[in-house]
């Protein structure tokens, strides 16, 4: 598929998925989020991972708060994204406790993240990551992901491959309404190892 056609298909699908997400009630988002939280906590890949990066969820994303609390409860090491808004660069920086999140400044996207001057341990320079949880707008069952168009995660996953001997396991968290028959992709798009949603097969 030509690049122009792929970009056009992505734009159309993003608009459709945003509409689907807007139609989801708060109760339904919470119901699916709690179900996915249980799936994550029972997942072998999660249980066997020590260094984990996870996104702080926006309103239209699977809620990650309980998973973050469990990461600390299990004695694992938690990293969260710090986006650079003037580029597509993102680092995963260490979070010291789940309670700390509320104290972090908010971005223009209304999500908390450590400020630029806040010096923190960065995952790739201190041993890498075992597991990365990814958000996104849409996914298919082959692991193709449609993000919001900035390229943060695709760029970061390529850096992981360069910096780590063993590639981190990547797991997307999705509402079932975000699962599509096929996601349009180009050569820059990175697949995820597993898409977790309400009806996804048990691992």
Curated annotation (Swiss-Prot):
Keywords: Acetylation, ATP-binding, Cytoplasm, Folate-binding, Ligase, Magnesium, Metal-binding, Nucleotide-binding
Domain of life: Eukaryota
GO cellular component: mitochondrion
Subcellular localization: Cytoplasm
Bilayer-crossing regions: none
Enzyme Commission numbers on file: 6.3.3.2
Chief subcellular location: cytoplasm
Cofactor or coenzyme needed: Mg(2+)
Modified residues (N-acetylalanine): 2
Residue numbers binding ATP: 10-14, 145-153
Amino acids binding substrate: 56, 61, 148-152
GO molecular function: 5-formyltetrahydrofolate cyclo-ligase activity; ATP binding; folic acid binding; metal ion binding
Reactions accelerated catalytically: (6S)-5-formyl-5,6,7,8-tetrahydrofolate + ATP = (6R)-5,10-methenyltetrahydrofolate + ADP + phosphate
Gene Ontology terms: biological process: tetrahydrofolate metabolic process
Chain sites annotated for binding Mg(2+): 154, 189
Signal peptide range: none
PANTHER family listed in its UniProt record: 5-FORMYLTETRAHYDROFOLATE CYCLO-LIGASE, ATPASE INHIBITOR/5-FORMYLTETRAHYDROFOLATE CYCLO-LIGASE
Assigned protein family: Belongs to the 5-formyltetrahydrofolate cyclo-ligase family.
Self-association state and partner proteins as the record states: Monomer.
Function: Contributes to tetrahydrofolate metabolism. Helps regulate carbon flow through the folate-dependent one-carbon metabolic network that supplies carbon for the biosynthesis of purines, thymidine and amino acids. Catalyzes the irreversible conversion of 5-formyltetrahydrofolate (5-CHO-H(4)PteGlu) to yield 5,10-methenyltetrahydrofolate.
Family matches, as NCBIfam families: MTHFS_bact (TIGR02727)
Name assigned to this protein: 5-formyltetrahydrofolate cyclo-ligase
